[in-house]
């Protein structure tokens, strides 16, 4: 038995634009139905299947609630795999990456928690801009190469945002 499509699991049509509140509600509903504790008195095979269904549901939810993971998944459904560690080939974006990394390093050296918060806010705006761009481009099947380029950028910003969170935690301690 193969893994069902993440969107089908939630009775959604594959699309980038999702109602995240509706997704979360449906996830909670499905999680209650497939939770392994409900199968504690069942046979070993049923328990194993419940664990598998629960794991599949969790993976699907994590994928769909993240814009970059959702975009990457949509492309994969169409046969356009974007590796997780895909590099961005766009010179302008590479320069932007260098600028962000230098700024993050300065914030770290200065232990500037307020500066980190402002930096994080700018990253969030950049992420939202990429999400909006992907949503527009996704509607045009002829622009899948552009969509792949945006996913690479989205993945970079996700990684950088994680680094910012780690810096915040270190500075907060």
Curated annotation (Swiss-Prot):
Assigned keywords, A-Z: Chaperone
Transmembrane segments: none
GO cellular component term of the entry, any: iron-sulfur cluster transfer complex
Record-linked Gene3D superfamilies: DnaJ domain (1.10.287.110), HscB, C-terminal domain (1.20.1280.20)
Pfam families: DnaJ, HSCB_C
Domain J: 5-77
UniProt GO molecular function: ATPase activator activity; protein-folding chaperone binding
GO biological process: [2Fe-2S] cluster assembly; protein complex oligomerization; protein folding
UniProt family annotation: Belongs to the HscB family.
Assembly: Interacts with HscA and stimulates its ATPase activity.
Record's function text: Co-chaperone involved in the maturation of iron-sulfur cluster-containing proteins. Seems to help targeting proteins to be folded toward HscA.
Name recorded for this polypeptide: Co-chaperone protein HscB homolog
Organism: Stutzerimonas stutzeri (strain A1501) (Pseudomonas stutzeri)
């Amino acid at each position: 038995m193969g893994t069902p499509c993440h969107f089908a699991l939630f009775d959604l049509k594959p699309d980038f634009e999702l109602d995240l509140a509706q997704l979360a509600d449906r996830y909670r509903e499905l999680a209650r139905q497939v939770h392994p504790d409900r199968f504690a008195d069942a046979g070993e095979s049923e328990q194993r299947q419940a664990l598998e269904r629960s794991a599949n549901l969790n993976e699907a939810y994590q994928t769909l609630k993240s814009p970059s993971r959702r975009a990457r998944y949509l492309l994969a459904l169409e046969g356009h795999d974007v590796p997780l560690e895909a590099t961005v080939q766009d010179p302008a974006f590479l320069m932007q990456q260098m600028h962000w990394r230098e700024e993050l390093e300065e914030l770290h050296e200065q232990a500037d928690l307020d500066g980190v918060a402002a930096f994080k806010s700018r990253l969030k705006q950049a992420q939202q801009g990429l999400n909006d761009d992907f949503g527009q481009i996704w509607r045009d099947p002829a622009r899948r190469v552009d969509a792949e380029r945006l996913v690479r950028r989205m993945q970079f910003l996700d990684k950088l945002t994680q680094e910012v969170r780690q810096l915040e935690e270190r500075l907060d301690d």
